[in-house]
């Protein structure tokens, strides 16, 4: 129960920080059968019962045609709990296996196909938001992947609008630690569906970065949490994006630890922006 409350508080902070849920929302909760999506569904259902705003949750799973897919585990679990649930059958597995060479990871194409299906189903079900189960560790892993392999300073947005403008995607677990979600899933005995049914291997770059983060956190506890905090504590003038400088009206950076910064005298320095302010400035 203590772990459930801790995760609920972290999720609540994310929802509040990024205005993820509004009164009257109908949330499509994408449930893959993994620990994270089960946890997200359980926490959202709890929140819907006690939140000051009224919203509803419908769980959706996509049976993508993987051989031996045990979809009945999810169906039985949702029925036993009396949860609103839809199982959608779409054979994307044959498309992926046809397009992707043997021994290559299917994950990227599979994910894109699944996302497109979710967008369509959300419209059909009248859902105003789509909730995905990405967590803190996903966010910081993506940050490092982009830094190392793409030369970009970005993670995954906690809230985004789809290219077609019809769907808003939210990530309520973005402040939650993967280890705590795993412990919660074990505590609740969720009937987990394995993610390797297709036989595809995890992306090697992501696997390497995940291991790097695990090693760093073992040697320097709090590494992942500090990286998450950094994503919400941005100093644009200490970055090299000239377009960002122009949009924010920056002319020169301030020294670290300047008297103004230390004393907090006067108005906040324009180059010190919590992430919420940054997003509003760029909107």
UniProtKB/Swiss-Prot annotation:
Q: Which Gene3D superfamilies match?
A: HUPs
From the UniProt record, list the reaction(s) this protein catalyses.
Answer: cytidine(32) in tRNA + S-sulfanyl-L-cysteinyl-[cysteine desulfurase] + AH2 + ATP = 2-thiocytidine(32) in tRNA + L-cysteinyl-[cysteine desulfurase] + A + AMP + diphosphate + H(+)
As to how many cofactors bind and how, the note says: Binds 1 [4Fe-4S] cluster per subunit. The cluster is chelated by three Cys residues, the fourth Fe has a free coordination site that may bind a sulfur atom transferred from the persulfide of IscS.
Query: Transmembrane stretches, by residue range?
Result: none
Cross-referenced Pfam families, in alphabetical order? ATP_bind_3
What the entry lists under SUPFAM superfamilies is as follows: Adenine nucleotide alpha hydrolases-like
Query: Where on this chain is PP-loop motif (motif)?
Result: 32-37
Give compartment(s). Answer: Cytoplasm
Q: Which residues bind [4Fe-4S] cluster?
A: 107, 110, 198
Per the record, the GO terms for biological process are: tRNA modification
Query: What superkingdom heads the lineage?
Result: Bacteria
Q: What is its EC number?
A: 2.8.1.-
The protein's required cofactors:
Mg(2+); [4Fe-4S] cluster
Q: Which GO terms describe its molecular function?
A: 4 iron, 4 sulfur cluster binding; ATP binding; metal ion binding; transferase activity; tRNA binding
Its UniProt pathway annotation is: tRNA modification
Q: Which GO terms describe its cellular component?
A: cytoplasm
- Alphabetically list the UniProt keywords: 4Fe-4S, ATP-binding, Cytoplasm, Iron, Iron-sulfur, Magnesium, Metal-binding, Nucleotide-binding, RNA-binding, Transferase, tRNA processing, tRNA-binding
InterPro entries (alphabetical): Rossmann-like_a/b/a_fold, TilS/TtcA_N, tRNA_Cyd_32_2_STrfase, tRNA_thiolation_TtcA_Ctu1
Q: What does this protein do?
A: Catalyzes the ATP-dependent 2-thiolation of cytidine in position 32 of tRNA, to form 2-thiocytidine (s(2)C32). The sulfur atoms are provided by the cysteine/cysteine desulfurase (IscS) system.
HAMAP family the UniProt entry points to: TtcA
The family annotation for this protein states: Belongs to the TtcA family.
Q: What else is known?
A: The thiolation reaction likely consists of two steps: a first activation step by ATP to form an adenylated intermediate of the target base of tRNA, and a second nucleophilic substitution step of the sulfur (S) atom supplied by the hydrosulfide attached to the Fe-S cluster.
Q: Which NCBIfam families match?
A: PRK10696.1 (NF007972)
Complex formation:
Homodimer.
Name of this protein: tRNA-cytidine(32) 2-sulfurtransferase
Report the source organism: Sorangium cellulosum (strain So ce56) (Polyangium cellulosum (strain So ce56))
Traced from the root, the source organism's taxonomic lineage reads: Bacteria, Pseudomonadati, Myxococcota, Polyangia, Polyangiales
């Amino acid at each position: 129960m203590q772990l459930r409350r801790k995760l609920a508080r972290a999720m609540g902070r994310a929802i509040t920080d990024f205005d993820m849920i509004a009164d009257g929302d109908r949330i499509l909760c994408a449930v893959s059968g993994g620990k994270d999506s089960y946890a997200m569904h359980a926490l959202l259902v709890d929140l819907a019962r006690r939140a000051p705003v009224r919203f509803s949750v419908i769980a959706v799973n996509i049976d993508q045609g993987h051989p031996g897919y045990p979809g009945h585990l999810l169906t039985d679990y949702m029925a036993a709990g009396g949860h609103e649930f839809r199982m959608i059958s779409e054979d994307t597995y044959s498309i992926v296996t046809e397009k992707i060479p043997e021994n290559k990871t299917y994950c990227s194409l599979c994910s894109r196909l699944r996302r497109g299906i979710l967008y369509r189903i959300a419209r059909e079900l009248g859902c105003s938001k789509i909730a995905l189960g990405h967590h803190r560790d996903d966010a910081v892993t993506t940050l490092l992947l982009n830094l190392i392999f793409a030369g970009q300073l970005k993670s995954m947005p906690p809230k985004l609008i789809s290219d077609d403008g019809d769907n808003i995607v939210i990530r309520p677990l973005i402040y939650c630690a993967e280890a705590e979600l795993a412990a919660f899933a074990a505590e609740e005995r969720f009937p987990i569906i394995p993610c390797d049914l297709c036989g595809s291997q995890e992306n090697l770059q992501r696997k390497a970065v995940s291991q790097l983060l695990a090693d760093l956190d073992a040697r320097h506890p709090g590494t992942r949490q500090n990286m998450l905090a950094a994503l919400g504590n941005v100093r644009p003038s200490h970055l090299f994006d000239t377009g960002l400088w122009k949009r924010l009206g920056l002319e020169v950076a301030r020294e670290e630890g300047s008297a103004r910064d230390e004393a907090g005298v006067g108005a906040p320095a324009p180059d010190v922006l919590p992430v919420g302010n940054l997003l509003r400035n760029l909107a």
